[in-house]
């Protein structure tokens, strides 16, 4: 009724021991470590069970991965030999805007990099993070400075046709004349403040407050009150 089975001891050794004898597995062949998978798998992305790719956008993958050769070497050489590929270290194989695909899609400065002559050096010099070039100061000749000083003595503000005529007579642009007059007015105001000194500035402030007091109290006075005197 019951099939005869071999007797088993209920010792720890008999319970832990395996019933089947240990079989040696086949040794790993060196050719099994060759990474010869097609590079198209990088472009298509890993297919999830739901059927959606983790990398749906092909722009996220560098174009160098398509040209990679399959890696085949012995297991003991993996830790000793450095992996250097010419596609990553050679400038002749590097795409100009491969690492900056968002630059061409930007509506503010994307039009500046359209064309075949775009390089990474151009991107660093004229890109969004490039420094603004300093404005070159105009070196005026002595005769030009003399004419400009005379025009400033007549009028501190030269605009319109007068500025255009002055610029043409001095072989300068209107922007250069405009900037010179702006700087000259700033220098003139600074010189006036230095000549007047702090005492004159304080007296002007005092007279201003006195005039406001007279207007508020409807009082008139022909003489000026010295606000700097102690009396």
Swiss-Prot record:
Q: Which GO terms describe its biological process?
A: brain development; central nervous system development; neuron differentiation; pronephric distal tubule development; regulation of transcription by RNA polymerase II
The record's section on SUPFAM superfamilies has: Homeodomain-like
Keywords of this entry: Developmental protein, DNA-binding, Homeobox, Nucleus
Which Gene3D superfamilies does the annotation name? Homeodomain-like (1.10.10.60)
Q: Locations of Basic residues compositional bias? A: 203-212
- Domain of life the protein comes from: Eukaryota
Pfam families, per this entry? Homeodomain (PF00046)
Which residue ranges hold the DNA-binding region?
133-192
Q: What function is annotated for this protein?
A: May function in combinations with OTX1/2 to specify cell fates in the developing central nervous system.
Q: What protein name applies here? A: Homeobox protein EMX1
User: What gene makes this protein?
Assistant: emx1
